[in-house]
Curated annotation (Swiss-Prot):
The keyword Cell membrane applies. This is UPF0719 transmembrane protein aq_1349. Its main location: membrane. It comes from Aquifex aeolicus (strain VF5). PANTHER family: UPF0719 INNER MEMBRANE PROTEIN YJFL (PTHR40043:SF1).
Amino acid sequence: MSGFLIALFWVIFSKYVFDVLFFREAKIEREIFGNKNLALSLSYAGYFLGLAFSFYSVYFYESLFREVLYLIFVSFTLLLGVYIFDLIFLRKIDLKEEILRGNAGAGITQGIYFLSLGILISASFWRKESFILSVIYSLIYLSLGMVMLFISTLLMSRLLKLNFEEEVKKENFSASLVLGSITLGVSVVLYGAISGEFMGSLIFDLFSTVLYFVVSQVLMVIFYVVVEFLLFRKVILSSEVYENNLSASLILSATFIASAFITLAVMG
């Protein structure tokens, strides 16, 4: 019962924090239900899924004060992580403005990144005797994970010859979906790497995480080449995504996410 009450408080608290930090000028209910803003709905859906995944992995009741403290830390980390990603990788566009004007590509980009970061946070969170120690360990792994998300997105942007920033701004939903699948795939790999058995040393654990990431990127590229040049030789999938062909983006998205699970199988 206490877990349910804590979760209820956390969801309500997180919802209002999200509204204030991201969309304080907008009337959320009117945007979603009155204006039928799909972009904002996608962003919200990803946010709540990210919260739920974090709660599932982080919550372990010890004391009311301690659990509330942990969950507030997770909420702010989730919001801060998405803000930093927007600031660094999508710095040329105002994602909030794009979402409010109904750009579904911007909405799915932010929504999937919320989910990806929720998965990453749940893997990165280390429950130690000291709250401060828990925060430090968690931030080390989370920071490493965010750097890897950025590197992977940059790498695939070059490989596919797609400027994701420009495509999101142009309301290219297909490109946004591919971008989301890349971040989701990497977060799944990192979840498997970080949440595995502790190797007895922080340095060894960090090295193992980097190794997982490198293998995942190699496999992601190999799978892309196989799908692009062997399975679908008569079309250039990346060009189709550029033309906002949703069918092509679904093929590529499935390829990137599948490569993540195969990485876990190979490395496991």
